[in-house]
Amino acid sequence: MNAHEVNFDGLVGPTHNYGGLSYGNVASQSNSQAVSNPKEAAKQGLAKMKALMEMGFKQGVLAPQARPDTAALRSLGFSGSDEEVIRRAAKEAMPLLAACSSASSMWTANAATVSPSADTADGRVHFTAANLNCKFHRSIEHPTTSRVLAAMFNDERYFAHHAALPAVSQFGDEGAANHTRFCKDYGDAGVEFFVFGRSAFDSRFPAPQRYPARQTLEACQAVARLHGLSEAGVVYAQQNPAVIDQGVFHNDVISVGNGEVLFHHEDAFLDTEKVLAELHDKLGRRGGRFRAICVPRDQVAVEDAVKSYLFNSQLLSKADGSMLLVVPEECRNNPRVWNYLDQLTGDDGPIREVKVFDLKQSMQNGGGPACLRLRVALQERELAAVNPGVIMSAGLYDTLVAWVDRHYRDRLSETDLADPQLLLECRTALDELTQILKLGSVYSFQLD
């Protein structure tokens, strides 16, 4: 059955800034208050999309959120016109304005969890927007995320959309950053791998002590039920709490999977042997041959994995059957990581090539190649039903670069967030973007 994995990358929004909002994300916290360059950030992301498209990979784009979010500020007691709301928030509660101005939706691995039609009970592709309950600045994203996804995947014959889980800590859900899928071919029934950091209701599971575990077992189970997944096609695993406390805030910072391969750090999971055995068994029953590539801690320490974002990479299947690992520049700058990658590609394993991208603007906020994309496996007929306006092409790339040049600033500091003109600039840009991507009205300011 002919099917493709399509990577939908998040377009970096015009308010990209370094607010240091993400406790537990080492890069985000260490670069707090630095001056950002939204124009460069957006172009770095677009360059990656274009390069992968030109290599033959299916590539799409996911629109950013409208920021500053004046509706969120109003819900917190700020009143008056939009301009007055921003000025008052800047004067009285700058951290709230920074949170409501975050461009964190660029990391579309957190947008939703996606289950392909081959896995689901009703034979449709299922989407559940992530509630991102752990962080206020991200918890306000899911209503717009749901509207954008519905505008992209709008044929009910093929696509089913679910609202985010209840916005409470017991159902904390971070989307595809804690989810991957193994399969022989993208169109075959596969095994969906859900990784959680803690259990909300079962005290037998340990929890990290320093940083919060953002994903619960109960959220994973709820998404699997919503998507109509069978027990034979699901594996749940607990991430090692010790690595969460070292800055591994999502599982895609310590492992990445694709096809029949899991590329992971030795310390990524609890009960690793049991987890790998279950993946091997369940994928085998679905016609696949599971293979784990374990990176030993004595070659790459967890600290190096977090600094370089070795595992926050894209693992892509090439036409010849081998795999390509897309990594950030920071991997090349870390001798231990780069030596390991040189050894990896020299071995007779599935990962034969490494491609490096400069994503510094995103990386300084704690997001690498994997954070920037949402993977959707689609049959040919499903791909044909996707809104064509969001599928990357040479023409769309040129249009989006020109759009960025027209609307984005090349410098943004925290004090700039207090400028009401920024709100006007962002809304003007996004109103035009919805026309470019043929999304219709998806933003609150378009619906009011």
From Swiss-Prot:
Annotated catalysed reactions:
N(2)-succinyl-L-arginine + 2 H2O + 2 H(+) = N(2)-succinyl-L-ornithine + 2 NH4(+) + CO2
The UniProt keywords, alphabetically, are: Arginine metabolism, Hydrolase
Q: Name one Pfam family in it.
A: AstB
Q: Quote the InterPro entries the UniProt record gives.
A: AstB_sf (IPR037031), SuccinylArg_d-Hdrlase_AstB (IPR007079)
* Record's keyword annotation contains Hydrolase: yes
Query: What role does this protein play?
Result: Catalyzes the hydrolysis of N(2)-succinylarginine into N(2)-succinylornithine, ammonia and CO(2).
Describe, as the record does, how this protein assembles with itself and its partners: Homodimer.
- UniProt-listed HAMAP family: AstB
Q: What is this protein called?
A: N-succinylarginine dihydrolase
Q: Which organism is it from?
A: Pseudomonas aeruginosa (strain UCBPP-PA14)
Question: Taxonomically, what lineage is the organism?
Answer: Bacteria, Pseudomonadati, Pseudomonadota, Gammaproteobacteria, Pseudomonadales
